[in-house]
């Protein structure tokens, strides 16, 4: 006869780099970048899970059980606003940097849920006492509240697409590329000008 293996809980599961996950609150709402905003400083909030890329996260290992948590759509990291460490510090996204404000520890519990702790502040990812769509995330001291427990699930379905979101992202990428071209061209132009100047005798 065959013995069925018990379903693995996240507490027993390794977060694999290159895979993507949803981070769900106790009421099933997931953590997302608000309004698929690709800008630095965009808020991180709760929302109904609609299987969009901006509701999915990668865990990038930074050593010793510490991770950077990267949004699948924007490519930016979950970060503490202004590197704050006090209760109520807002959590937002920021481009990846060697910053301690972007380091998080995933602490498993016996029931398969996790606590997500800022490695810098020693405080937990927390939606406050609110649960509705649009609730902005913060950090708060560990009070073992139900709102401080999260469920991490691997994304196995192909994410839904949004023409509007994809257009916004493509436009931003084009603008960034154009800026990089200008930056690269400027030193070359300055060098050419210097070379063209007659030597002063």
Residue spans for each PLM region:
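Lectin-like carbohydrate-binding module/patch detector with strong preference for beta-trefoil
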Residues: 5-164, 168-169
């Amino acid at each position: 006869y065959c013995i069925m293996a018990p379903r693995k809980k996240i507490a027993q599961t390794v977060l694999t780099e290159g895979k993507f996950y949803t981070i769900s609150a106790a009421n099933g709402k997931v953590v997302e970048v608000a309004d698929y905003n690709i800008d630095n400083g965009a808020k991180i909030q709760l929302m109904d899970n609609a299987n969009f890329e901006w509701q999915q996260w990668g865990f990038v290992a930074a050593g010793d059980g510490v991770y950077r948590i990267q949004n699948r759509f924007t490519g930016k990291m979950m970060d503490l606003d202004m590197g704050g460490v006090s209760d109520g510090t807002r959590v937002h996204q920021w481009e990846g940097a060697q910053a301690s404000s972007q380091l998080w520890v995933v602490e498993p519990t016996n029931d398969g849920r996790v606590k997500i702790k800022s490695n810098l502040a020693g405080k937990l990812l927390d939606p406050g006492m609110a649960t509705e769509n649009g609730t902005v995330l913060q950090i708060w001291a560990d009070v073992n509240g139900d709102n401080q427990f999260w469920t991490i699930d691997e994304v196995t379905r192909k994410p839904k697409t949004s023409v509007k979101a994809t257009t916004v992202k493509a436009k931003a990428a084009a603008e960034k590329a154009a800026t990089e071209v200008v930056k690269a061209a400027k030193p070359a132009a300055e060098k050419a000008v210097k070379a063209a100047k007659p030597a002063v005798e």
